[in-house]
């Protein structure tokens, strides 16, 4: 932060400082030797939020030499372009969608990822769809990683002996960041899904169902699987309560789309209706049981109740302070001054 404000890079560690180089390479080697045989390791990391410089570039060179089969990632080089080959991908934290578009319009030599984005603190993850939609239009944008998955909180008992999830300041420490680490899409403790999880799940689904009044366009974004491996269900809910349910056979090949006629007719009785087309697992998986919903789309419409004429009519009386309305079986007075019922 000091370097960003002052442009004085003497404060940056490790940067180009030779006294730090052996230590950084030792750290890289220790991590490499520990994890090199783990199949889950796809990318080597040179660290996090340490600006740029020669020392981190040498770490990257070490990984490339010892393991040319894997990629190397580092975000800080976006602040120091002298060693742009440090990372095999362009990596930035929390850029706007417009900033990503602008960058790739000038330089698309590398795939672009957000190593952190859509910070999930509090009532967040809004407008996340702008980033996931960008993957459909910008080939070099490869997505991002949400900070964070689980609230960084721990169990603590209140004065009544009841457990709760505690965070900064709950132990009397000052200064503190308070709830800054309560930034997950899953709650701490029992790992229940927060309301943010629903938004994330919807944006990450690999099947898009664009539902209209009488049809649904199914867009299969999966690379390898047909939609026929899932059960497709169609439900109609009236004022929030499901009143009809049926199935729909789909067979959309990977990376293609098909439009199907909805098997349920449009409702005629007054009310608000939600038509939902959803896809579910047919059988148990390691990560979810049969019936688990993997994707859905929805269309909402209203059937208005016919308007009834008032045979006796109504009388409106206006004054300086109030407006009165009188009918056959009612009287009501509105305040002009306060804008409400009197």
Model-derived regions: residue spans:
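Beta-strand-rich N-terminal accessory domains
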Residues: 276, 281, 304-342
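Short, well-ordered beta-strand segments enriched in hydrophobic/aromatic residues
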Residues: 215-220, 325, 329
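Hydrophobic residues positioned within well-ordered beta-strands of beta-sheet architectures
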Residues: 214-216, 232, 260-262, 275, ...
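A short, sequence-level motif marking secondary-structure junctions
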Residues: 94, 250-252, 335-341
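Intrinsically disordered, low-complexity Pro/Gly/Ser/Thr-rich segments with frequent PxxP/GP/PP motifs
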Residues: 230-232, 237-270, 279
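Terminal connector regions
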Residues: 267-306
């Amino acid at each position: 932060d000091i370097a960003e404000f002052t442009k004085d890079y003497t404060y940056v560690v490790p940067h180009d400082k030779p006294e730090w180089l052996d230590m950084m390479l030792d750290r890289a080697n220790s991590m490499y030797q520990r994890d090199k045989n783990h199949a889950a390791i796809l990318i080597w990391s040179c660290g996090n939020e340490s600006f740029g410089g020669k020392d981190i570039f040498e770490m990257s060179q070490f990984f490339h030499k010892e393991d040319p089969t894997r990629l190397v990632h580092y975000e800080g080089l976006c602040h120091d372009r002298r060693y742009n080959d440090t990372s095999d991908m362009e990596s930035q934290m929390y850029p706007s969608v417009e900033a990503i578009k602008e960058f790739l319009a000038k330089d698309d030599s590398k795939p672009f990822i957000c190593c952190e984005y859509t910070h999930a603190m509090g009532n967040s993850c809004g407008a996340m769809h702008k980033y996931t939609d960008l993957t459909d239009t910008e080939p070099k944008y490869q997505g991002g990683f949400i900070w964070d998955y689980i609230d960084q909180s721990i169990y603590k008992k209140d004065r009544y002996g009841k457990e709760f999830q505690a965070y900064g300041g709950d132990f009397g420490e000052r200064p503190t960041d308070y709830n800054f680490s309560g930034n997950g899409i899953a709650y701490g403790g029992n790992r229940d899904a927060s309301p943010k999880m629903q938004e994330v799940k919807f944006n990450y689904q690999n099947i898009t169902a664009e539902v209209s009044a009488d049809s649904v366009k199914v867009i299969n974004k999966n690379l390898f699987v047909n939609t026929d491996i899932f059960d497709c269900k169609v439900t109609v809910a009236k004022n929030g309560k499901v009143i009809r349910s049926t199935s729909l056979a789909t067979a959309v090949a990977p990376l293609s789309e098909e439009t199907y006629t909805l098997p349920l007719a449009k409702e005629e009785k007054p009310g608000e209706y939600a038509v939902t087309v959803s896809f579910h697992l047919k059988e148990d998986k390691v990560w979810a049981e049969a019936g688990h919903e993997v994707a859905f789309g929805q269309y909402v419409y209203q059937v208005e109740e016919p308007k009834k004429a008032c045979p006796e009519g109504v009388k409106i009386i206006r004054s300086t302070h109030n407006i009165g309305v009188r009918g056959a079986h009612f009287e009501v007075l509105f305040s002009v001054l306060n804008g409400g019922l009197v």
